[in-house]
């Protein structure tokens, strides 16, 4: 459909009845969707989504949590896909019936619906060409198009027939299983009868086989035709599966969010018909218990690949002697990596919607790998559900078999899309890792050097040279123990990529070729296997030379009791040890191939070489997002809180070359009644102290006292849970100590039991559990303590992914504006990059300055959005800083909050506004009964997955 075109299909808006989607009209809001209960706001959401997909736009959609965003995405996107496929079939039927294709001067772009039409009809002809030549070329193009459509239609018909057979096969599966069991019982009875006859008094016993001779006995023969009949696989199946139909890739951040989305698909009107497949990591989908027990993601990945390659390499010579087939089945040591069984798993996964847990159970039952089986289902799937880290990383995307050409991508929970893309492609390596990798590689060459070919030796020596120069640029010596090396110069140095290559004296090495060699040879995996097998042999050598090697081997062993007893630092607890230092360094080498203007290298020289680091900082995340936008038909970026949208427009879309006209914004209001939320901006405190928590003023005693007094007053009128966010952990500790010293903490404790967010990720769930239990107890006991106060940190463990719905968060307080550290070298470099790259809009701040404000407001929006989580929820939001009253700042709040904000110049009217609504807003209104403890724990699951993925 072209933007501004006419209507296609009947259009109508009805009441809360069951609808049938039948078309779209861009100049009308009349759309009917297949969903039983559909609020008007959700109709607008789905109608706009449909238009974005039809017109091939880039959409930024905001729909607050609890407003039915997932269901709207499902119904809007799948309705478009269904209509798209229907129009494609109708157009193909018309072309096949008439035997002619569309000419180049036809205006309706929707006639050429398939990628197979590209380059067929409509080829511009040179000026002055004879008419008969033009007519001949057009006729030939039309015939070619019709022939292609016939072939495509035949393939689609075969695929649909096979999928119908698959659905029928799933229904007959258990009946066939019972027949197999009966057959096995019959065979067992026959075998027992033969044994009884053979063991008779006059029976002649066969000669006892010697050890090893069992392998010489012929196994039961089964022909290829019998296997084919048993599995239902025909010769053309591979060809059918290779064709990627038009599909929707739906991405989200965590596996739990994806599972929830799949559950919503099952409940939707499309649940019985859509072909859906869920993709995940090996850690989530592996069914081999020996591999799963390794725990670490990298260890699981290494072992999986090694098990696939080991037997294949051993039997490579024997396979070459066999008659070559069109596609040979790989030999694999893993019993679940069986192509025939994985094909069956693929078929059953497409027959009906399954989430990841069901896919895992199916893999165990069928003894097939769900990780690879799910990838086999991608071509025929209509809806592919996957973590968006898998989509944004080009190598992972290619390895998974994901093809984005002319497809639709929907990225849900996309508020952290820029940060995730940046962190995925930013790499930091330590001096200790560089020395460990160098020592391992030297030992590997000593062991196998005589068996290696010249080209292998050449690349290994280049890698050794690179490692040596990386250590040298930090000021260390590769031959000495990194833990005992003290650096003469300390501090941080930031360089462009080219300057770093020149300073390191590695500008003469082709890093692209080295990166390719590492990928193809899998040297890091082989090196890790080498350290596992022979680490003990080399541990007897002198300590200084092999310190890095031994330290790596020791890191693989369980920690000692003393180490476990020591308090773990937050960064150490959240970052797992890599399986191989070289594997991590390969990521750094790949990052150095980025364009010079898109990244920087930060040299951080600490006291010792082992603590010093080299970090690649990606400045332009759009360079990795541009390929997605370029290939896809349409891209939708959706989330509960997408403000400030200018962040996405500038850093992600404008830098990716997306024209402003192609970007469509849509913000959906909240479904809660207007009086269910009370957002306040308080400009001065109880003692009329102006509230402006700048870096220079926030440490003043009177400012910290004002926060305490305001909280005391709020806790006196708000029943239930109060969550107060501070800009940083350090400031929270400082304020807490000041309150304790001045007595304000005791006054607060008399009204609310006080909880404090832990810095360790492992203690978050415990604190949340105690907090929710305290609120439940206070609700049952009418005493002086009316609830609990949770002191949290913006950007911490509880500002994202934890839902403070209902009584868990009746009031959310934001202390100050949580601006990022402006003195950070990384932030300053990003600001400078944006100032140089993006133009300054008239009347707007410089792009670099706007970035700082956007980062602040994004953190604020994520924190205050924790309170309202469903339609019948209610809470107050208090922003303690007069800077929130500025129009440019208010404009970056979510629309549903911004429309209801009340700015109070003094504290008196503010607390009066809270007191005015208190009798009905907090005490008398009955909220929906919910299990706060289980809800808190489910919310904490998001944080566990987030920590694991990081």
From Swiss-Prot:
Gene3D superfamilies named in the record: P-loop containing nucleotide triphosphate hydrolases (3.40.50.300)
Annotated positions binding ATP: 63-70
Renumbered residue ranges of the record's region Disordered: 191-213, 220-239, 308-331
Cofactor(s) named in the record: [4Fe-4S] cluster
Family annotation (Pfam families): DEAD_2, Helicase_C_2
The protein's name: Putative ATP-dependent DNA helicase DDX12
SUPFAM superfamilies: P-loop containing nucleoside triphosphate hydrolases
Annotated cofactor note: Binds 1 [4Fe-4S] cluster.
InterPro entries found in the cross-reference section: ATP-dep_Helicase_C, DinG/Rad3-like, Helic_SF1/SF2_ATP-bd_DinG/Rad3, Helicase-like_DEXD_c2, P-loop_NTPase, RAD3-like_helicase_DEAD, Rad3/Chl1-like
Ranges of Basic and acidic residues composition bias in the record: 191-208, 308-323
Domain Helicase ATP-binding: 28-464
Tissues in which the protein is found: Only transcribed in proliferating tissues; the probe used detects both DDX11 and DDX12P.
Family matches, as PROSITE patterns: HELICASE_ATP_BIND_2
Function as written in the Swiss-Prot or TrEMBL entry: DNA helicase involved in cellular proliferation. Probably required for maintaining the chromosome segregation.
Gene Ontology biological process terms from the UniProt entry: establishment of sister chromatid cohesion; nucleobase-containing compound metabolic process
Family: Belongs to the DEAD box helicase family. DEAH subfamily. DDX11/CHL1 sub-subfamily.
UniProt-recorded Gene Ontology molecular function terms: ATP binding; DNA binding; DNA helicase activity; hydrolase activity, acting on acid anhydrides, in phosphorus-containing anhydrides; iron-sulfur cluster binding; metal ion binding; RNA binding; RNA helicase activity
Keywords linked to the UniProt accession: ATP-binding, Cell cycle, DNA-binding, Helicase, Hydrolase, Iron, Iron-sulfur, Isomerase, Metal-binding, Nucleotide-binding, Nucleus, RNA-binding
Top enzyme category: isomerase
Subcellular location: Nucleus
